Amino acid sequence: MEHTYQYAWVIPLLPLPVIMSMGFGLFFIPTATRNLRRIWAFPSVLFLSIAMVFSIQLSIQQINGSSIYQYLWSWTVNNDFSLEFGYLIDPLTSIMLILITTVGILVLIYSDGYMSHDEGYLRFFVYISFFTTSMLGLVTSSNLIQIYFFWELVGMCSYLLIGFWFTRPIAASACQKAFVTNRVGDFGLLLGILGFFWITGSLEFRDLFKIANNWIPNNGINSLLTTLCAFLLFLGAVAKSAQFPLHVWLPDAMEGPTPISALIHAATMVAAGIFLLARLFPLFISLPLIMTLISLVGTITLFLGATLAIAQRDIKRSLAYSTMSQLGYMMLALGIGSYQAALFHLITHAYSKALLFLGSGSIIHSMEPLVGYSPEKSQNMVLMGGLRKYIPITRTTFLWGTLSLCGIPPLACFWSKDEILSNSWLYSPFFGIIASFTAGLTAFYMFRIYLLTFDGYLRVHFQNYSTTKEGYLYSISLWGKKIPKRVNRDFILSTTKNGVAFFSQKRPKMKGNTRNRIGYFSTSFGAKNTFAYPHEMGNTMLFPLLILLLFTLFIGFIGISFDNGAMDNGIAELTLLSKWLTPSINLTQESSNSSINSYEFLTNAISSVSLAIFGLFIAYILYGSPYSFFQNLDLINSFYKESPKKYFFFLDQVKKKIYSWSYNRGYMDIFYTRVFTLGIRRLTELTEFFDKGIIDGITNGVGLVSFCIGEEIKYVGGGRISSYLFFFLCYVSVFLFFFIS
């Protein structure tokens, strides 16, 4: 055991030899390195696999072991201050190491196929390997200054990968937006680190936690200053994990390659903020005000992310808002003291979201031969549909990932989300109501993504779609065609200016009167001569999907735990995660509310699953196949015919406002642009005017006046008698004028 711990410092450094080798190869033998570029994927996967084996061994030893601090070397600034660099191995570190390495390996394998035709193949592998190294260094750090160093490296790598296709202006703008937004949080994190060093005199976690466990108002520590420093640390996590109000960078980060989106959302950048709060949990739990703030921010974020996801057309952007919402659940769990539930959801969500993002990459790859290599088209769900018969393996894996995120048992996210919902109800009904409602909303927008992508018929060959208008009906009408206010409901068909039928002229007949029917959300297409259809990707891209599917199916079972009451009911007690997920420094004990008996578990599970099924049901009604079972029963049409027109008009207006608000990202970007961007520009213009007009004006004016006076004096003293006589008479005249007056 000690032998393994002795070499644990090697884990973050294992990907570095591959990075250095690729760099030397590009520098000394660039032609050969580029021609043989795909061979570099093997050593990248190999070295990260070695790191994974080390991580698994450490995790097994940590189940019944204790935390290990190991210092490698010390940088002494003076006799009173020194920085000690080392590593900390505890259950939290072990879990994060496994998470990063497993997801990282699968993303690397997937990237070999996804990026095979890209000119930046080698550059991508250098960036992603360094990204993994930075995150591994972050989770093994033993003090705050070491965390900050790797924290900045993670931010730098995300900047490089989000703007990987930097020749595209949108990608360049997106990476700048992510970088600037995270600067706010990183600055707060740095101030918080310096503040706690000033308060406690140490940057080591164990010293901070010992002091935090003992501080009370009588021990001389300023509680207001301590709370402020803790808030600044929390601000860093807010920015990195895309929490409200610093969440605006996350959807734009989808401009990077899809594999890096999977890695960012599953195991690296956005997980760093949750990891920081989990690492400092014994510190935060001693500050009730900060814990309340964490839970409030998490609650706002989980609801906001879900509402913003319901109207997006871009498949990756929809998944990005889903990540934002799920991170809000983790933040809420940490805020209410449910440490185990938060990290459990971090694990289950990581594998499910990696599966969904890699599946979306397969979808995008299959659409590119049809619509071109523009993300505005290849990622647009408006142009998809009916892909289940073209990419069946991707469809199956994507469906299981969707159901997992919806909270359907026995998939991974069901167990963790149900635990968070139960604890939130026990902590506060307010948090419980919002978290439960958002759980149903999650099922709605996730199943919407699935239906728009795989259900119905392929819509890419439709000629009259729009990609410019931003009406709310994008999320209702799959075609992106903004419907005018007055719609003739006697007809299902709609025509364009060119006279081309918007729907197929050969539509199946429906029983009953078609008059006063509402427009359906997808349709059946007639045969159309086409030469290209989506197709399944190669085995290199499918293999990671299948492995992640296994994780999604079975990883949730490690977190099933019941108390002794459950044992009496004959239910086996599985406490692997309970032994594993404990605070890194065991100074606090988790609330007993986190352990529930079988009756409470079944009650909470039934309610959460009912909400999820209701969300799936609503999504299927709105976005399912056009002639589904419910529509053939005239369920929607009978509701419309029996409802008052005023009520239906009001409902339509409310729906329009909601979808418009959601599609425009809650107008947060517009608000930030007008308040901060334009406000700063106006402030700079005012500063420029003050600097050049007033400050420079006074300085230049004094110089100009001095110059003019000097010129006049020079002119007077030029040696001309006429000038002397003229000024003599002028002075005499002025003197006489004042003397006489």
UniProtKB/Swiss-Prot annotation:
Q: What class of enzyme is it?
A: translocase
Q: Name one GO biological process term.
A: ATP synthesis coupled electron transport
Q: Where in the cell is it found?
A: Plastid, Chloroplast thylakoid membrane
Q: Which residues cross the membrane?
A: 9-29, 39-59, 89-109, 125-145, 147-167, 185-205, 219-239, 258-278, 280-300, 327-347, 354-374, 396-416, 425-445, 542-562, 605-625, 721-741
What membrane topology does the UniProt entry give? Multi-pass membrane protein
- A Pfam family cross-referenced in the UniProt record is Proton_antipo_M
Q: What is its EC number?
A: 7.1.1.-
Please, which domain of life does this record's source organism belong to?
A: Eukaryota
Question: Which InterPro entries does the annotation name?
Answer: NADH_UbQ_OxRdtase_chlpt_su5_C (IPR002128), NADHpl_OxRdtase_5_subgr (IPR018393), ND/Mrp_TM (IPR001750), NU5C-like (IPR003945), Proton_antipo_N (IPR001516)
Which keywords belong to this entry? Chloroplast, Membrane, NAD, NADP, Plastid, Plastoquinone, Quinone, Thylakoid, Translocase, Transmembrane, Transmembrane helix, Transport
The entry's cellular-component GO terms read:
chloroplast thylakoid membrane
Q: Molecular function terms in GO for this entry? A: NADH dehydrogenase (ubiquinone) activity; quinone binding
Which chemical reaction does it catalyze?
a plastoquinone + NADH + (n+1) H(+)(in) = a plastoquinol + NAD(+) + n H(+)(out); a plastoquinone + NADPH + (n+1) H(+)(in) = a plastoquinol + NADP(+) + n H(+)(out)
Q: What is its main location?
A: plastid
The protein's matches in PANTHER family, at most eight in alphabetical order, are given as: NADH-UBIQUINONE OXIDOREDUCTASE CHAIN 5
* Protein function: NDH shuttles electrons from NAD(P)H:plastoquinone, via FMN and iron-sulfur (Fe-S) centers, to quinones in the photosynthetic chain and possibly in a chloroplast respiratory chain. The immediate electron acceptor for the enzyme in this species is believed to be plastoquinone. Couples the redox reaction to proton translocation, and thus conserves the redox energy in a proton gradient.
Subunit arrangement? NDH is composed of at least 16 different subunits, 5 of which are encoded in the nucleus.
Query: What family does the Swiss-Prot or TrEMBL record give for this protein?
Result: Belongs to the complex I subunit 5 family.
Q: What is this protein called?
A: NAD(P)H-quinone oxidoreductase subunit 5, chloroplastic
Organism of derivation:
Lolium perenne
The primary gene name is ndhF
